[in-house]
């Protein structure tokens, strides 16, 4: 998108903004700048559902690059935006964050996004590289409640490097039932899927700066 088109849409009020504040024009405008900082190579992106809701459970170390890497890699490979929980709900940070796809990490907001058919990136807890961190037992309750696909994703790269690889696993089967034990089983299966991708990523690590 060129700056002229961006400015014209601002003036005439035709810029697209969804219910949660995502501004597609802003995302398109900053995408080239993001590409200068992060080069993302996606492997098996066809495992991300082409339509409908899904939770992309991914690893993180510091958690600075990973949400951007996930969103950029998935969007370039599939054309689908990824919503990122963890937004600080304080203006003006919240306004800018929502324009770029961030959302507040609340069950009602995540459930609403999934019911509307969006992709949501859900980070595991911070841990060492190549290790899947913890995830709260109830974190995937919105996915189970809405029937959303749960897809493990491994992000392989370095905060100081530019090159990242994004490895997408097979969607995790939903357990029977809808109670706390079923949610905990889904969390365990998602973490195991991420860890399996990280364990198999040795070849993908070769050559990373």
Mark where each language-model region is.
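Non-catalytic C-terminal accessory region of glycerolipid acyltransferases
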Residues: 2-25, 111-209
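Helix-to-loop junction immediately C-terminal to a conserved catalytic motif
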Residues: 21-23, 27-60
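Residues within well-ordered alpha-helices
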Residues: 29, 93, 109-110, 139
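Short, flexible loop segments at the rims of nucleotide/cofactor-binding pockets, characterized by
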Residues: 31-38, 97-102, 129-130
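Short, charged beta->alpha transition segments
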Residues: 43-45, 105-113
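Pocket-edge structural micro-motifs
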Residues: 44, 58, 86, 124, ...
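Catalytic core of membrane glycerolipid acyltransferases/transacylases, capturing the structured
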Residues: 50-109
């Amino acid at each position: 998108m060129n700056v002229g088109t961006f400015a014209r849409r601002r003036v005439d009020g035709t810029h697209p903004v969804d219910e949660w504040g995502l501004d597609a024009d802003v995302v398109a405008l900053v995408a080239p700048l993001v590409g200068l900082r992060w080069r993302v190579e996606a492997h098996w992106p066809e495992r991300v559902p082409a339509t409908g809701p899904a939770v992309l459970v991914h690893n993180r170390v510091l958690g600075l690059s990973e949400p951007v890497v996930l969103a950029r890699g998935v969007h370039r490979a599939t054309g689908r935006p990824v919503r990122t929980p963890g937004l600080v709900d304080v203006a003006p940070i919240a306004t800018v964050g929502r324009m770029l796809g961030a959302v507040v990490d609340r069950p009602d907001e995540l459930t609403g996004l999934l019911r509307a058919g969006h992709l949501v990136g859900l980070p595991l807890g911070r841990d060492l590289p190549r290790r899947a961190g913890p995830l709260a037992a109830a974190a995937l309750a919105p996915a189970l409640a809405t029937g959303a696909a749960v897809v493990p994703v491994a992000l392989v790269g370095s905060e100081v490097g530019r090159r990242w690889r994004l490895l997408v696993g097979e969607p995790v089967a939903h357990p029977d039932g809808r109670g706390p034990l079923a949610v905990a089983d889904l969390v365990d299966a998602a973490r195991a899927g991420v860890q399996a991708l990280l364990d198999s990523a040795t070849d993908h690590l070769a050559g990373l700066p």
